[in-house]
Amino acid sequence: WDVDYVMMPILLGFIGYIASIVGVFSMAILKNGDDPAVALRNTTFIGAGLFWLGGYGAIQSGLIGVEMGIMHSVVLGSIVGILIGLVTEYYTGIEPVMGVKTKAIPHIGEMSKTGPATNAIAGLSVGMMSTFVPVVLIALGILGANKLGGDTYGLYCIAMAAMGLSLIHISEPTRHKT
C-alpha cells in the first residue's frame, strides 16, 4: 500500500473538522434571517462545500496522491449524509423542508384526537416509514462507492464514503448550541 492511502483519512478528517468549524461559525451570519431552520441547514451545506473543496484541492495540488474516484466516494457519502439529515428533518419537523410540506407530525397530532391507541399506531407507522428512505440511501451509497472504487479500491471507497457521511454530521450537535 502507498502511504498516501493511509494518510487520506487523516487528512480528510482534518479538512472535515476545519470545514465543520467554519460551518458552525457561519451560523452567526446566517441566523439573522427569517427562518432558523434554513440557517441551520445552510451551515451543513457550507461545511460540506468547504470539505469537498478541501478534499479535491488536496488531491489536485498533489498534497496527497490518490485516485480521484476515492474522493468521489467521499462526496457520495457526504451527499447520502445530507439526504438522511433532510429526510430526518422531514419526518420529525412541522415546517416544510426545502419546499416540501411535511405531513408526518401533523398526522400523528390528528390521530391523537381519536384516542391513545390510534396515536400509538400512527406514531409507530410514521417511525417505521421514516427508516425506509435512509436504509435505501445507505445501500445505494455502498453500491455507488464500491463501483467508484472498482476491483482494486472498492472496500476502501466504501470506508471513505462512510467517513464522508460521518464528517458531515460532526457539526450537527454543536450547531444547535450557537
Task: Please provide the spans of the model-predicted regions.
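Hydrophobic packing and interface segments
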Residues: 1-171, 175
